[in-house]
């Protein structure tokens, strides 16, 4: 398959640059994988799409204020985007400056904090904080929320709350698991009252999620890796749900990738998973765990629209996106969502 097969024209005004006033006031496009049937809904209508005994799996990662500004020893300005925290003092990061900092040179951050450039690993830089504080403490103090490039505006105070799920619990992501942004505490309670169970996985979304696919053939793409965890508790809940005829509904592509990574690593029955994953899901992939998913609208030619096409069918997804554009749905991280059921192989 060609990467260009997943292209589409999106009017600029459909890119959501701010969230809706209320988390649940987004629209929800439903897509039935088997029939291709579409439905225009409000997000709270998700209550009518789930059944007692279903299990909804959320990604509980917390977005860290991963963008730092500072200058090199030479005085040149630079911007650091944390890709992942290696420990309390060291990070792997993308560095943007006129010239890359050299190994063993110092970087002075806003707020007077200092870092040393330890090594370069391909496109990423390894830096160490020279301070008694931890990296996380410094990020919380002087870091900026790492809004995606297509939002195309500086971060604002409101983003610290809204570019974050209400159930975030595990700091480490540099991008939000955006399907989860539509849920507030009241909706989560209503799902529980309906008899829908919930479970939480962790996948720390990396900046690689915004990297364009740079090859012509889908099969040639090398996926970035991200750290994921699926606990024994989640495994047990999935087994119970499947045994009683319920569906596993993944909230977001990161939850899908976490669960399918665990399944891929398990020989027979699903096992807990706790390590890096570079799973790349594209048409032809057979899903082993997930029956339905909630997801936002994705970028053209992205690995995420490839994942969705694998799940609900290439033609079905193409048609759904054409419908969404015609009906002026809001796209990307702060945009509207879809509720999608799996197409049988």
Swiss-Prot record:
Annotated GO biological process: queuosine biosynthetic process; tRNA wobble guanine modification
Protein EC: 2.4.99.17
Record localization: Cytoplasm
Ranges in coiled-coil conformation: none
Catalysed reactions, as listed in the record: 7-aminomethyl-7-carbaguanosine(34) in tRNA + S-adenosyl-L-methionine = epoxyqueuosine(34) in tRNA + adenine + L-methionine + 2 H(+)
Keywords: Cytoplasm, Queuosine biosynthesis, S-adenosyl-L-methionine, Transferase
GO molecular function, one term: S-adenosylmethionine:tRNA ribosyltransferase-isomerase activity
Pathway participation: tRNA modification; tRNA-queuosine biosynthesis
Predominant subcellular localization, coarse grouping: cytoplasm
Record flagged with keyword Transferase: yes
Classification via SUPFAM superfamilies: QueA-like (SSF111337)
InterPro entries documented for this protein: QueA, QueA_dom1, QueA_dom2, QueA_sf
Lineage top rank: taxon: Bacteria
Signal sequence annotation: none
A cellular component term, taken from the record's GO annotations: cytoplasm
Quaternary structure annotation from Swiss-Prot or TrEMBL: Monomer.
Biological function: Transfers and isomerizes the ribose moiety from AdoMet to the 7-aminomethyl group of 7-deazaguanine (preQ1-tRNA) to give epoxyqueuosine (oQ-tRNA).
PANTHER family attached to this UniProt entry: S-ADENOSYLMETHIONINE:TRNA RIBOSYLTRANSFERASE-ISOMERASE
Record-stated family: Belongs to the QueA family.
Protein name: S-adenosylmethionine:tRNA ribosyltransferase-isomerase
Organism: Shewanella woodyi (strain ATCC 51908 / MS32)
